Swiss-Prot record:
Compartments (UniProt record): Cytoplasm
NCBIfam families: tsf
Name of the protein this chain belongs to: Elongation factor Ts
Protein biosynthesis recorded as keyword: yes
GO molecular function (one): translation elongation factor activity
Example of a GO cellular component annotation carried by this entry: cytoplasm
Family: Belongs to the EF-Ts family.
CDD domains given in the database record: UBA_EF-Ts
The keyword Metal-binding appears for this protein: no
Reported function: Associates with the EF-Tu.GDP complex and induces the exchange of GDP to GTP. It remains bound to the aminoacyl-tRNA.EF-Tu.GTP complex up to the GTP hydrolysis stage on the ribosome.
Keywords: Cytoplasm, Elongation factor, Protein biosynthesis
Chain intervals for the UniProt region annotation (Involved in Mg(2+) ion dislocation from EF-Tu): 78-81
Source species of the chain: Mycoplasma mobile (strain ATCC 43663 / 163K / NCTC 11711)
Length: 294
């Protein structure tokens, strides 16, 4: 017979459901430590069954200390789970742990870094079993300060769907935070003009040369018009050329020059970037379930 007090204790230790704890204790003859292990193994089995499900929701979050800036994305199947406090705590726990490590020392930091006895990947798999939905640790990146003049800024949008981390040189923490907020809002593709690939400029030039409206202009002035259009496009996609949302009328470059500052590196994440969300036909799904039960 299962000890009710041990069920309560096991639930407190693992956050697992009542029935799962009861099964674990039955399977291990009321041995708490063995029951914890049973739940972990069973949780991984459950996670494996969920492996083919698409995880396009979730949270992104940026963290920083006096040396590193870290940004991570952990995905879930539904936005409902993304709002779950246990899921938020998991994201925060992993982010804070990653601030202790230099990413360059690892081949696969998600599989190598541990919290307690579990790797980060195993921790997410265990949480998947507890929360009851497939979770995926999709990605993590780090920026690193190389001198005392450099400052890290992070910004997390209130909904947890967008975040950014930035390093600047010769600036304040408040300035770095405002600039990282700009990156979160405006999503620049490139840090500065030097980072814009030549193939991007060639691509834009080719597109504008084929533009019917430009073809109607006199041939002599077309190159100048095209250069102007390229510069306008780059001012929309390049961080230093964008208009600063906090100081309208000034570009980021002008603002930073006035502070004798310049950007070093940036990373921006948005939940589900590049993931094709699964579109579910509810009527068909119900019909298939009824068919399988028949």
């Amino acid at each position: 017979m299962v000890d009710a007090e041990k069920i309560k204790k096991l639930r407190e230790m693992t956050d697992s459901g009542f029935l799962d704890c009861k099964k674990a204790l039955e399977a291990t003859k009321n041995d708490l430590n063995a029951a914890v292990k049973w739940l972990q193994e069973n949780g991984k089995a459950k996670a494996a069954k969920k492996a083919d499900r698409i995880t396009a929701e979730g949270l992104v979050a940026a963290f920083s200390n006096d040396k590193y800036g870290v940004i991570i994305e952990i995905n879930s199947e539904t936005d409902f789970v993304a709002k779950n406090q246990k899921f938020k705590d998991l994201v925060n726990k992993i982010g804070q742990e990653l601030l202790k490590h230099d990413f360059y020392k690892y081949k696969n930091i998600i599989e190598e870094v541990k919290i307690g006895n579990e790797t980060l990947a195993e921790l997410v798999a265990s949480a998947s079993a507890t929360i009851g939905e497939k979770l995926t640790f999709r990605r993590a990146e780090q920026v690193k300060k190389f001198n005392s003049k450099q400052v890290i800024g992070v910004y997390n949008h209130f909904d947890g769907q967008k975040a950014a981390v930035l390093i600047i040189e010769n600036g304040t923490e408040d300035m770095a935070k405002q600039l990282s907020m700009h990156i979160t809002a405006m999503n620049p593709l490139f840090l500065d003009e030097k980072e814009v690939p030549e193939k991007e400029i060639k691509k834009l030039r080719s597109e504008f040369e084929k533009d019917e409206q430009i073809q109607l202009k006199p041939e002599k002035i077309r190159p100048k018009i095209i250069e102007g259009m390229i510069n306008k496009k780059l001012s929309e996609t390049t961080f230093t050329l964008q208009e600063f949302v906090v100081e309208p009328g000034q570009s980021i470059k002008q603002y930073m020059n006035s502070k004798n500052s310049f950007p070093i590196s940036k990373i921006r994440y948005e939940v589900g970037e590049g993931i094709e969300k699964q579109v579910v036909d509810f009527a068909s799904e119900v019909a298939n379930q009824m068919k399988n039960k028949a």
